[in-house]
Every structure is written in structure tokens, then in C-alpha cells.
Amino acid sequence: MTEHTDFELLELATPYALNAVSDDERADIDRRVAAAPSPVAAAFNDEVRAVRETMAVVSAATTAEPPAHLRTAILDATKPEVRRQSRWRTAAFASAAAIAVGLGAFDLGVLTRPSPPPTVAEQVLTAPDVRTVSRPLGAGTATVVFSRDRNTGLLVMNNVAPPSRGTVYQMWLLGGAKGPRSAETMGTAAVTPSTTATLTDLGASTALAFTVEPGTGSPQPTGTILAELPLG
């Protein structure tokens, strides 16, 4: 199996875990996983497990089903022609849908409450200019789903090892007149097999970069850039 095919198989882990594939597609994926090299099969199974654990947490917090338009977004993203257009689009949309459910805290059983305003995740997913980009980060991946129109984005980190104790991952918005701007920090306890964060005020930034910084973070990047995701 070529490296390109391995990546194509790994990107199917999220829709597989969310049951967003047909029975025939599931059987085909099972055959491909069985025939894949051991590291690829292990990575696929780890991703499926992480997604299902995330959804289990969401289900424990609310009995509501995800909004219909998010389910549609997942199914649309899993179509073969869409997968060909963007290697990472399927996983990013499916993971972002899980974020939307978790952040939205939908309580459809309480009908007397007024409709809540759209969550950040919903605003990004429904934006006409929504885009996704993903890059390796250590042994895992970092994906950003973002909208310039909404000036915000969603970060999804899968299977990224936590930083060493006494350090943090620090995310930086690069570009623009102000130079690097800190967007978020994550310590050891904050990084799990499936980690999410909201990115606000993208402004004129052209990329999101990751470094490891001492203590609780730095005013400016001091560590080596571990990954850089273009936001153009």
C-alpha cells in the first residue's frame, strides 16, 4: 500500500466511527484495514476509538441528536468526489460536527426556552467560505476549520502527544502588521486523544503555527515551529 493510499485510509476513520458510510463502504474499509501495514491499521483504530470516546462524552452530557444540517454536512463530506477534492475535508467536517454538538449543549427537551444563538462551530460550518487545512503534528494531526467571513475557526487535534511537564503547546496567528499573536495555550492535562479549541479574531493572519513554550507560555515564539497551517 502506498503512502498516499495510507493517508486516504486514515482520513476515513472519522466517518467510519460516526457511521457516516454505507454498508458496502464499511466492508471495503474493513478489508483495507485488514490488509494495511500494522502501523497504519493501528493508527486507523486509534482514530476510530478517539472519535467514539468523544461522542460518548457528548452523549452523556445531552440526549439530543446532532442538528440535521450537521449530519448532512458529514454525509456530503464523505462523498467520493468531495474526498478527491480535499484529503482532509471529511475528517475535519466530521470532527467539527462533534465539536458543535459538544459546545452547543443542545437541550431540545426544554421547549419553553428560547432558541439559543448559533454556536461558534455552527457559524463556521455554515459559513459560505468555510475551509479546512490539516498538517501532521508530532505523531498526530492538527486540523483547522475556519471562515474568514466569520473571523473565527475550530482547531481539532487528534492523537497528539501532550507537551512535557512544565511546558505548553502555544498556538500563534502569523502574518499581519502585529506579527505573531498568541491564539491559545495547552498544557499537559489539556491535551487528550481528541482535543478541540476555538480560534477567534483571525484578522489578517496567514497561518496558524505551533511551538512548545516554557511555563504557561511566552509573549513571542521562542521554540521551533512544530507545524504551520496556512489560513490563506
Curated annotation (Swiss-Prot):
Q: On the Cytoplasmic side, which residues?
A: 1-90
- One protein family per Pfam: RskA_N
What highest taxon heads this organism's lineage?
Bacteria
Has UniProt tagged this entry with the keyword RNA-binding?
no
Q: Gene3D superfamilies in the record, alphabetically?
A: Anti-sigma factor, zinc-finger domain
In its UniProt record, a GO molecular function of this protein is: sigma factor antagonist activity
One of this protein's GO BP terms? regulation of translation
Q: Which residues lie on this side of the membrane: Extracellular?
A: 112-232
For the keyword Transcription, the answer is yes
Localization in the cell:
Cell membrane
Q: Which GO terms describe its cellular component?
A: plasma membrane
**How does it sit in the bilayer?**
Single-pass membrane protein
Q: Which InterPro entries match?
A: Anti-sigma-K/W_factor, Anti_sigma_zinc_sf, RskA_C, RskA_N
Write out the transmembrane intervals.
91-111
* Keywords carried by this UniProt record: Cell membrane, Membrane, Transcription, Transcription regulation, Transmembrane, Transmembrane helix
Give the similarity note. Answer: Belongs to the anti-sigma-K factor family.
UniProt note: domains: The cytosolic domain interacts with sigma factor SigK.
Chain's role: An anti-sigma factor for extracytoplasmic function (ECF) sigma factor SigK. ECF sigma factors are held in an inactive form by an anti-sigma factor until released by regulated intramembrane proteolysis (RIP). However, in M.bovis this protein is probably dysfunctional, due to at least 1 of the 2 naturally occurring polymorphisms in its gene, when compared to M.tuberculosis. This leads to an increased expression of SigK-regulated genes, such as mpb70 and mpb83.
Q: What is the name attached to this protein's record? A: Dysfunctional anti-sigma-K factor RskA
Naturally occurring in which organism (per UniProt): Mycobacterium bovis (strain ATCC BAA-935 / AF2122/97)
What gene name is given for the protein in this entry? rskA
